């Protein structure tokens, strides 16, 4: 499930036929259910990505501090001795594996914000 696809779905679902408001209002619970299911799915995907981030963060910390298994350094040599905490943090901040997962988490956050905005639209329909 990606943001573009969800936005396209919403663009189609948000169209209201003003000549048939009764039937349109009956669709609201179905749409709410549909987008709440998507919201829950994306939330779980984000949580899985957060879990991945935590595991990879530990692996990369061990890598930069010289505590990773020897075979890791055979596959991906690291020629520096990093001793200071802020130097380790700089390497961690620039690490491709970590930034890739961090971007995934941010993407899920943006998707969830969009879905929250969609849910507010449904709530307004119930107020009228």
Please give the residue ranges for each predicted region:
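Eukaryotic intrinsically disordered, low-complexity tracts enriched in Ser/Pro/Thr/Gly and charged residues
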Residues: 1-9
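Extended, amphipathic alpha-helical coiled-coil scaffold segments used for oligomerization/tethering
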Residues: 55-99
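Short, well-structured hydrophobic secondary-structure segments
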Residues: 30-63
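Short amphipathic alpha-helical segments with coiled-coil-like heptad repeat character
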Residues: 50-51, 115-118
């Amino acid at each position: 499930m990606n943001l573009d696809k969800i936005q396209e779905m919403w663009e189609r679902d948000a169209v209201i036929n003003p000549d048939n408001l009764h039937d349109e209002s009956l669709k609201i619970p179905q749409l709410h259910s549909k987008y709440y299911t998507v919201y829950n799915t994306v939330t779980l995907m984000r949580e899985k990505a957060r879990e991945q981030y935590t595991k990879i963060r530990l692996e990369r910390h061990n890598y930069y501090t010289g505590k990773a298994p020897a075979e890791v350094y055979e596959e991906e040599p690291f020629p520096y001795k990093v001793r200071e905490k802020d130097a380790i943090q700089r390497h961690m901040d620039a690490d491709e594996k970590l930034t890739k997962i961090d971007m995934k988490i941010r993407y899920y956050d943006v998707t969830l914000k969009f879905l929250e905005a969609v849910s507010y639209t449904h709530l307004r329909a119930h107020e009228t």
